[in-house]
Amino acid sequence: MTLELTPIPCLTDNYAWLWHDTATDTVVVVDVPEAAPVLKVLTDRRWQLHHILITHHHADHIAGVEALAQATGAKVAGAAADAHRLPPLDHPVAPGDVLHLGMEAAQVIAADGHTLGHIAWYLPGAGLLFSGDSLMSWGCGRLFEGTPAQMFDTLTRLAALPPETRVCSGHEYTAANGRFALSLEPGNGRLHDRMDRVTALRLAGEPSLPVTLGEERATNPFLRADDAALRAALGLPGDAAPLAVFTAARARKDRF
């Protein structure tokens, strides 16, 4: 692999995801909650930023985009369907599009649910998924604009990617999401094992991300809608449809 990945903490619990393609010296960032922390890393490493990718319109993901673009000359890419709510786009994209960024081919995947017009960026060569606030570490984004069915479709689509894919979501929410998962299944040893690892990372000042998609499939309640143990934990009948299980889990999380 020729790609260096750096999660940059921003605001209270956000991440900007910076990557450097060492083969071509191409530098890309996904989401910019604020410009200053990203500029500091670029300056410290003497890197020139070339591209800014946006997942969705919420201010805690785009507030620093224009300042960073002006400071670096980087080109901005985001969903054409959401352009009216985004900073000016040099590259309006749609699901199914591919942007060639250095040696990487970044695929655009529809990720509606948290917001409408949300997209995810998938790098099959590097095995990286930048999911914004759709699929999150040990959770999923709250449904501000979309429906449970839309988010369920998004998660099903993302979960079909290779299990070794590393998920880079927009927030350091892993521990909080894990507490919810454990509230549903307090006897699940795999959940406790993951919480132990997350706790150790955070105590060491390290990010809990990225995480493999395989780990998410095994422990994230929102990716386990066909799991009998989760249905039982939610008090649902054994023949409950996966969408009903997901909807019940999301409603429970909203009240947690």
UniProtKB/Swiss-Prot annotation:
Pfam families per UniProt: HAGH_C, Lactamase_B
Disulfide bridge partners, by residue number: none
Pathway note: Secondary metabolite metabolism; methylglyoxal degradation; (R)-lactate from methylglyoxal: step 2/2
Any coiled-coil regions, as ranges: none
GO terms of biological process kind: methylglyoxal catabolic process to D-lactate via S-lactoyl-glutathione
Domain of life: Bacteria
GO molecular function: hydroxyacylglutathione hydrolase activity; metal ion binding
InterPro entries, alphabetized: Clx_II_MBL, Glyoxalase_II_hydrolase, HAGH_C, Hydroxyacylglutathione_Hdrlase, Metallo-B-lactamas, RibonucZ/Hydroxyglut_hydro
Comment on bound cofactor: Binds 2 Zn(2+) ions per subunit.
Class in the EC hierarchy, top level: hydrolase
Annotated Zn(2+) 1 binding sites: H56, H58, H114, D133
UniProt cofactor(s): Zn(2+)
EC number: 3.1.2.6
Catalytic activity: an S-(2-hydroxyacyl)glutathione + H2O = a 2-hydroxy carboxylate + glutathione + H(+)
Primary role: Thiolesterase that catalyzes the hydrolysis of S-D-lactoyl-glutathione to form glutathione and D-lactic acid.
HAMAP family documented for this protein: Glyoxalase_2
Description of how the protein assembles with itself and partners: Monomer.
Family to which the UniProt record says this protein belongs: Belongs to the metallo-beta-lactamase superfamily. Glyoxalase II family.
Protein name as it appears in the record: Hydroxyacylglutathione hydrolase
Organism (species): Rhodobacter capsulatus
Gene name of the encoded protein: gloB
